[in-house]
Amino acid sequence: MHRSLRGEVGTLTIGFGIFATGTFFPAIIKEFKRRYQDVQVSLVEMTPVMHLKALQSGTIDVAFTRPMQSSDAETLRFEHFQTQPFCAVMLKSHPLAKKRSILIRELANERFILNDRNNAPVTFDKVISLCAEAGFSPRIGATSTASTGMIALVAAGEGVALLPEDSAVLRGNELVLVPLADRMASVDLVIAWTPQHENPVLRSFLDVALKKRRRP
């Protein structure tokens, strides 16, 4: 009983997206499993919209996700985890591929591969906003429900995509990630959970995870 109250025994289901698969995520999971070997951990890949529904229903205990709209966030608790700079994902043969960094206005004539807004509204709206601030409205070549699909579409020559720099782990040999030099060309990653479903195991996990966050 005492071990349960200390969060050393139990189960934990963690939601994540492909945007949360940088080096920090495996490190957190490994550290938590090392310290709490009697906690059964389940990992579930989801889109940000799916995270919201799963947290509210109690299907998952915690999620690495994007900030929610204020109306959706009323029942959730958030902690900022890191700010992820955007990179432009493009073919190695692209004229801009060899540049050390670019401004988003240099992509004004490109077709954009975007996240499906129904699944990732924060990221979609951020890209649209960045383009508007640069003086243009992006030509949307295609949308995808996942970063892996976006990268596949770029590889197929369907356009360019803006993805967080941690997505570098996904790129193939034919693609490059070029950093964006624009101010505010980034998107936040948060840890979210539902206070009404909070338990000792969740608190133990938050203690481990939040020690590894990057402050804004």
Region annotations inferred by a language model:
Residues 47-60, 66, 117-176:
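Hydrophobic hinge/microswitch elements
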Residues 72-79, 84, 89, 148-195:
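Beta-alpha-beta core module
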Residues 9-71, 144:
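Central regulatory/effector-binding core of bacterial HTH transcription factors
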Residues 110-134, 199-207, 216:
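Secondary-structure junction motif
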Residues 15, 86, 95, 102-122, ...:
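Short loop->beta-strand "edge-of-pocket" segments that line small-molecule binding or catalytic clefts
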Residues 105, 188-216:
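Extended ligand-binding regions for polar small-molecule ligands
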Residues 1-5:
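Alpha-helical linker/hinge and terminal dimerization helices associated
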Residues 35, 46-109, 167-171:
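Acidic, Gly/Pro-rich loop/turn segments at junctions of secondary structure
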